[in-house]
Amino acid sequence: MAGKLGKFQMLGFQHWKGLTSDNHLGAIFQQAPQKATNLMVQLLAFYRGKSLDTFLNSFPTREFEDDNEYYWDVIGSSRRNIPLVEARDENGVVVAANAANVGVGTSPFYLVFPEDWFADGEVIVGNLNQVYPFRILGDARMEGTNAVYKVELMGGNTQGVPAERLQQGERFSIEFAPVEKELSRKVGDVRFTSPVSMRNEWTTIRIQHKVAGNKLNKKLAMGIPMVRNLESGKQVKDTANMWMHYVDWEVELQFDEYKNNAMAWGTSNRNLNGEYMNFGKSGNAIKTGAGIFEQTEVANTMYYNTFSLKLLEDALYELSASKLAMDDRLFVIKTGERGAIQFHKEVLKTVSGWTTFVLDNNSTRVVEKVQSRLHSNALSAGFQFVEYKAPNGVRVRLDVDPFYDDPVRNKILHPMGGVAFSYRYDIWYIGTMDQPNIFKCKIKGDNEYRGYQWGIRNPFTGQKGNPYMSFDEDSAVIHRMATLGVCVLDPTRTMSLIPAILQG
């Protein structure tokens, strides 16, 4: 039976949704035969993964004026490679791959590109940049959408350039624009890249629960363990002795899970035409915004069958090479417990071949003395790699998040054990507190809502004798509602390494 804890458990777990009757309480909580403890055992191994709260609350929150879509701009780099369409000799004949060298004796010839990107007087280079530099001789002549440039070889090369270096697809970039010392004229130009406008939608969620009015003072024969949040943010273990305490806690706990799931895993329900395809009971469109994972996965995503440290290093260099300073290359990688073990084993493989690597017990404390009845000189041994320093200032630090190991939401199992999602690695450039790259969004003045409908008695608040009854039934309904959003400013600064078994 699912959720059965071996032969010592007398009954399986009982589950129900919605209104709780006296029969539920009597069957589950009220009957109290002799027990070893008056507290229920918290079963961490089944059905409830940990909340995403600690993960999402590590991001700052930014306020917006209203509930309209929120927009932001991502500006790309103006440094680009332009692929060659074709080359033509000085007579205008297309240069074939088996043709003789072109530009012999600094004779001019023509390069054709798909857009007008280069300027008069600039030196441009192809794949073999320093070997064959070319100088632009005048502005481009447009042929439809193609730009034709007259060029000559730059430098002391009089032998020309091999035709194989002038074939379609060779990529060219700008070097500089040299001029003579005296009486020089204008050359060169400046290029710009327009920002790409990004947008996301707010997600509004609700939850409700109905309780009979007579549950107001229902006590439990045994306490229900729960975790309570203090105003300081600290979590403490507590025990609910009244049924309504437990109901209130479950409402908040499950609504909190709604919120976190929407911000982390939410998917936009807008199609390519900007239309929303889902409608609520009112007939109005339901709008859901993209969560963190959907926003990051549009950028850099790699699926892997075999994990290696080189795979991870390659991913990190993609994010940092020529983009981040050497002292700004600390990456925090979110993963599960299985991913952390896999990371440790791969680092261990790498360092095990280092001849200078010595387990100096004075500094690493790999072996320590412990107390044990088994031996008078008992020792403990072990270590785990949680950080790796790669070349060029790249540092990798692991952060294990419990929701990667959640067996309820993550249903696909991995051949090596555990859920497959636990082997996922999310490399996120978080940014700074002044300019975060990932943050939660909030509408100014629009806090979460909590309201009640009730008849004669309201067991949620303890009120009795309602002179303005919402309905004649002796019950109460709690409603919770919130509008949420999350923003990843620049998804290209993030990367995900995902087990291939999770590829859809």
Swiss-Prot record:
**Which stretches are transmembrane?**
none
Summarizing the function annotation, the protein's role is: Capsid protein self-assembles to form an icosahedral capsid, with a T=9 symmetry, about 77 nm in diameter. Each asymmetric capsid nonamer is covered by 9 capsid auxiliary protein, 1 copy of the trimeric head fiber protein and 2 copies of the dimeric head fiber protein.
Q: What is the lineage of its organism?
A: Viruses, Duplodnaviria, Heunggongvirae, Uroviricota, Caudoviricetes
Subcellular localization is given as: Virion
The family database entries (Pfam families) matched by this protein are listed as:
Crass_capsid
Name the UniProt key words of this record, in alphabetical order.
Capsid protein, Virion
What does UniProt give as GO cellular component?
Answer: viral capsid
Query: What protein name applies here?
Result: Major capsid protein
Complexes and interactors: Interacts with the auxiliary capsid protein (via FD region). Interacts with the head fiber dimeric protein. Interacts with the head fiber trimeric protein. Interacts with the portal vertex auxiliary protein.
Keyword Cell membrane present in the record's keywords: the answer is no
Q: Taking the first listed entry, what is the main subcellular location of this protein, grouped into a coarse class?
A: virion
Q: Does the keyword Cell cycle apply?
A: no
Q: What else is known?
A: Displays an HK-97-like fold with an insertion domain that protrudes at the capsid surface.
> What InterPro entries would the database entry show?
Crass_capsid
